[in-house]
Curated annotation (Swiss-Prot):
Keyword Transmembrane helix: yes
Name of the molecule in the record: L-cystine uptake protein TcyP
Single GO MF annotation: L-cystine transmembrane transporter activity
Membrane protein topology class: Multi-pass membrane protein
Keywords: Amino-acid transport, Membrane, Transmembrane, Transmembrane helix, Transport
Pfam short name (any one): SDF
Task performed by this protein: Mediates uptake of L-cystine, the oxidized form of L-cysteine.
Organism: Bacillus cereus (strain ATCC 10987 / NRS 248)
Regions crossing the membrane: 3-23, 34-54, 73-93, 107-127, 184-204, 225-245, 263-283, 347-367, 371-391, 395-415
Length: 464
């Protein structure tokens, strides 16, 4: 019987995919197809919630099949991330886009990311205090116990890692290993490796222009192929969003969410406040924040459904270049740095809130100015090297809690609402990287304001 029900659910999903394909054939705009997929995915997931239990075998098996579309799409995006970073940043050097302002661009983007992460920590602290969020009364069931065991194992691996050690881990010792994404800091390491190649190209160009020109032509060909791959993958976005949203909603445990409702509400209030701060920073830079919101919303929608900052990176770069008018070099740097440095949601708001929740259990007053200032500083510094894939927030929380000498068990006790909160955190992470790129581009005078102010419904070649 279960097999029949699963088959029906999968058949309905395939019909919905067919509807999206029909919309594509009728040249419905890319943004409209993404929003349609989001809405239909939520409705389909709610219907499955109503018919079955979230933990039923039918839902679990159906979600496994839905994952072929949703998770498969995310994996394709992750596949292209490292090649995209490598060729894009080297290409920025060969096109003389970064040679004069490399240090200024990097410093400004990283500075904005770290600053906004510190602000995000303060927002998380305020939300925790305002909603009186506490770890008292949280119960440890089987799922929490299993998660706690994994958390303790992970904590053991990072317990003795100092901040200087973390900074050293950003440097690539084996760039080929980092191209596989094997380390949490692989993204930044690939950026550094690509920058070294770009700097070397500039030196070779001065002494051996013929060899440099040959390298440039080869790189241009590779760049064109990689960007074509990006375009092909991004065209699958509506299908990925549909499957991911249906899977997430169908598998969410409403009762568990209600038990931690205060924490969920406080988290989303903090996330929304921080997003408004992004818009205020954009407005203070002399740009229309509403225009920004309209143009990046499809990217944030995908980040929300996929829960992967790294997976959203190709969309992130494409939107920065084609919709916001940010120069190619700055767009690539902002998106690349934003995956591993200064994640406002996962490395800012989340660890700060957990620290505020658990501090009273060890006799610390979380509202003491010294504790708050120390926590903000620790959160900002610890945001270096947080992976832009699932588990990054846990990694950040463990570092912050251990540095503040606080119990780490709280990380396991909120597992039941982790997917729901992670969706909002990831969207904020991506918004933070795009905000850093936009503000940096504006301040350095490299923003194409005509492109930024232009109303459109397409993202480059994606919609075609």
């Amino acid at each position: 019987m279960n097999t029949l029900l699963v088959g029906i659910n999968v058949a309905v999903m395939l019909i919905l995919v067919g509807v999206l394909y029909y919309m594509q054939r009728k040249h419905v705009s890319f943004n409209k197809r993404v929003f349609t997929a989001l809405g239909v995915g939520i409705i389909f997931g709610l219907i499955l919630q109503f018919i079955y239990e979230p933990t039923s075998k039918v839902i679990i098996e159906s979600n496994t099949w839905f994952g072929l579309i949703g998770n498969g799409y995310v994996k394709l995006l992750q596949m292209i991330v490292m090649p995209l970073i490598l060729v894009s940043i080297i290409s920025a050097f060969t096109k003389l886009q970064l040679t004069k302002n490399l240090g200024k661009i990097s410093g400004l983007i990283i500075g904005i990311l770290i600053l906004t992460t510190g602000i995000a920590a303060a927002v998380g602290i305020a939300a925790s205090a305002g909603f009186d969020v506490s770890a008292t009364g949280l119960q440890q069931g089987d799922a929490e116990s299993a998660r706690l065991k994994l958390v303790e194992e992970r904590f053991t691996s990072i317990e003795k890692t100092t901040i200087p050690d973390k900074l050293l881990e950003l440097l690539p010792t084996n760039p080929f290993l980092d191209l596989t994404g094997a380390r949490p800091t692989s993204t930044i390491s690939v950026v550094i490796f690509a920058a070294f190649i770009g700097i070397a190209f500039i030196g070779v160009k001065r002494k051996y222009p013929e060899q440099a020109e040959l390298f440039k032509k080869m790189l241009d060909a590779v760049y064109a192929i990689v960007m074509r791959m990006v375009t092909l993958i991004l065209r699958l976005t509506p299908y990925g969003v549909l499957a991911l949203m249906a899977k997430t909603v169908a598998g969410s445990d409403i009762n568990a969410i209600l038990k931690l409702g205060n924490f969920v509400l406080a988290s989303y209030v903090a996330l929304i406040v921080m997003f408004v701060i992004h818009l205020l920073l954009i407005a203070l830079s002399g740009l229309n924040p509403i225009q920004y919101l309209k143009k990046v919303f499809p990217v944030l929608t995908f980040a929300f459904t996929s829960r992967s900052s790294a997976g959203a990176m190709p969309l992130n770069i494409e939107a920065q270049k084609e919709k916001l008018g940010i120069s190619e070099g700055i767009a690539n740097f902002a998106a690349s740095f934003g995956v591993s440095i200064g994640q406002n949601g996962c490395a800012g708001i989340y660890p700060a809130m957990l620290a505020m929740m658990v501090a009273p259990t060890v006799g610390i007053d979380p509202l003491q100015p010294q504790f708050i200032l120390t926590l903000i500083a620790v959160v900002a510094i610890s945001s270096f090297g947080v992976a832009g894939v699932g588990g990054g927030a846990t990694f950040a929380a463990l570092i912050v809690l251990s540095t503040m000498n606080l119990p780490i068990g709280i990380v396991a006790l909120v597992i039941s609402v982790e997917p729901l909160i992670d969706m909002g955190r990831t969207a904020l992470n991506v918004s933070g990287s795009m905000t850093a790129g936009l503000i940096s581009s504006k301040w350095l005078g490299e923003l194409d304001q005509d492109t930024y102010n232009q109303d459109d419904t397409k993202t480059g070649e994606i919609a075609s």
